[in-house]
């Protein structure tokens, strides 16, 4: 693990120090034996040892005010700890706040559409359901041309349900 020690004149206690540790999820013991008050865990659905790592890490996280645990990931099928934690969060069975961000909220995911572009029936349904514009639909077309619709829906899902069902 890499560790950065931080001291700051802005801390109330001038002798206080904080640290930032960076682990990779490649080792099943990553994060074990630590007591983080803030943990940002990235691409959790793709960890090889997700259950073991999270079990060890979660035991060290104090249940106190100011503690934050952020788990974020592209979905990787309806399986694994990320999926289980997501499902439980949606059902209100844990303290996590489920947040899904669809591809079309990203301003960069659009291309100027050609004049006279005609939408397919499926594209018309997407426009209606998600209030998309033709520039977004054209960007989507170009991405689908790169790798197919299945790959697009896996990497750029429109709903959480689609993210978990299409991937993996």
Go through each PLM region and give its residues.
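Non-catalytic, compositionally simple segments
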Residues: 7-10, 50-168
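Conserved RecA-like ASCE ATPase "motif II neighborhood" in helicase/translocase motors
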Residues: 2-60
